[in-house]
Amino acid sequence: MSIFIGGAWPYANGSLHLGHIASLLPGDILARYYRAKGENVLYVSGSDCNGTPIAIRAKQEGVTAKEIANKYHEEFQRCFRNLGFTYDCYTRTDSEHHHKTVQKVFLRLLEEGHIYKKTVEQAYCETCTQFLPDRYVEGICPHCHEAARGDQCDACSAILDPLDLLEKKCKLCGSAPSVQETEHFYFALHTFQEQIKVAVETAKQTGTWRDNAIQLTERYVKEGLLDRAVSRDLPIGVPIPVEGYEDKKIYVWIEAVTGYYSASKHWAEKTGKDDQEFWDREAKTYYVHGKDNIPFHSIIWPAVLLGIGEGTIPRHIVSNEYLTVEKRKLSTSKNWAVWVPDILERYDPDSIRYFLTVNAPENRDTDFSWREFIYSHNSELLGAYGNFVNRTLKFIEKYYGGIVPKGSIDVELKDKIEGLYKHVGEAIEQTKFKVALEAIFDAVRFANKYFDERQPWKEREDDPVSCEETIYNCVYLIANFVNLLEPFLPFSSERVRNTLSIVKRNWEPQNTLPNRIDSVQPLFERIDVKQIECEIEKLYGAVK
């Protein structure tokens, strides 16, 4: 089976925070799981280096947009690598290959009659003497009356036209813009109304889109899909490939989602492999992002794919809700966030991955609390999983000289593990990652109980053969926990694999156990709970 996984592209205008990772982590879990199953996986993403936010940041700092994009693209790559993300291709939207692919898609849509020219009114700043890109216009959302940008309202997820805003002002100078006529290209989105309606109805029946994606898309379909501008007067971006319009850029809402396609083509070019299988109707596709990106993946991108004749529109939309920080809405402008480069300096990446999975905002907003983060590490990773692995392997090291005793796999344990693979696999495929991880940790707690009840420290003296059976079965459990947890906790899984000399990584019960173990080291270190206050003080102290 061909599995395509697309992770949303973060804007390269500032550091990643845990809200980004909470929405993107499911992509890596899926990729690792499907690779272990032996499926053909293509997992792509990249840095959005063309957006208006980058141009604004560059102007504020007095540097070029390229310098800003380079800085954060490189930082993103380090963060994703240090968190264990296994992208097959992580690229950027200001690359030549991306520009060429986007321009080809634009021309194909133009040839097929899905793009047309239209004279429209656009916000113009007399002070800055320029037409204002949508994100350069700020004001009040006409739907929910919250503060909003000219392209979208974060509060109610409405896609906006900047002229719809109330109390409009230029983001650069703060003055009220005038309205002038200009010519732009438009995408005939209304012509895909019925196909999008069928797609959302199918997703509703099969449960392959998150509820928030279904509800929001149904709302747009009910209201009627409106044609959208595909060109803008932007300072940076992909030039319109039509004579006389080269100064205009392809609007980021269509250009950025086409990044999945350009990354796929770039991967094929670099590896010499054919990527068409990932765009065929039979391919299984997952698009992983936050709820603010829903309409771009449930409406815009499917319409673009249909418009260029590709068979596979998004089958699974994994659109997480928002992550709050200490019960407050995350705010980058106020510096109320937990920044990824910072937390990675002091904490195990598996601790971050664990917390953001068991507390994932899959169906509702969830909160990142330093207290909960540190206690979950100490009680679950260290106290449950790390404890079981350490006590078993230390027992072997102390009483068997590192040689794994011989035994036979207990039938009840074997059935339990086989059932666990099936249950966890189904949960991952259905994008229920929290359910999957909790099921594994239920089994870990069962394993600790098994160790306690068997009391190998007593069996060793009273019934040495039973003791060997107990320890053998504990190693059996560990070998399979490593396999089951690898999509979630890759770093600790790798450490245990090395200790047990386990090479196989396929998604099936591990029934062949190692003969000996290498030097046993603690899987996790206890985090001093005094760190809770330190981290909270640091968080509040950094607020702007």
UniProtKB/Swiss-Prot annotation:
Keywords for this protein: Aminoacyl-tRNA synthetase, ATP-binding, Cytoplasm, Ligase, Metal-binding, Nucleotide-binding, Protein biosynthesis, Zinc
Annotated GO MF terms: ATP binding; metal ion binding; methionine-tRNA ligase activity
Pfam families per record: Anticodon_1, tRNA-synt_1g
Record-listed Zn(2+) binding positions: C141, C144, C153, C156
InterPro entries in alphabetical order: aa-tRNA-synth_I_CS, Anticodon_Met, M/V/L/I-tRNA-synth_anticd-bd, Met-tRNA_ligase_1, Met-tRNA_synth, Methionyl/Leucyl_tRNA_Synth, MetRS_core, MetRS_Zn
Cofactor(s) essential for the protein: Zn(2+)
CDD domains noted in UniProt: Anticodon_Ia_Met, MetRS_core
UniProt cofactor note: Binds 1 zinc ion per subunit.
Motif ('KMSKS' region): 329-333
GO terms under biological process: methionyl-tRNA aminoacylation
Location(s), subcellular: Cytoplasm
Alphabetical list of PROSITE patterns matching this protein: AA_TRNA_LIGASE_I (PS00178)
Catalytic activity: tRNA(Met) + L-methionine + ATP = L-methionyl-tRNA(Met) + AMP + diphosphate
GO cellular component: cytosol
E.C. number: 6.1.1.10
Binding site for ATP: T332
Residue window of motif 'HIGH' region: 10-20
SUPFAM superfamilies xrefs: Anticodon-binding domain of a subclass of class I aminoacyl-tRNA synthetases, Methionyl-tRNA synthetase (MetRS), Zn-domain, Nucleotidylyl transferase
Signal peptide bounds: none
Subunit structure: Monomer.
Similarity comment: Belongs to the class-I aminoacyl-tRNA synthetase family. MetG type 1 subfamily.
Main function: Is required not only for elongation of protein synthesis but also for the initiation of all mRNA translation through initiator tRNA(fMet) aminoacylation.
PANTHER family listed in its UniProt record: METHIONINE--TRNA LIGASE, METHIONINE--TRNA LIGASE, CYTOPLASMIC
Protein's name according to its UniProt entry: Methionine--tRNA ligase 1
Species of origin: Bacillus cereus (strain ATCC 10987 / NRS 248)
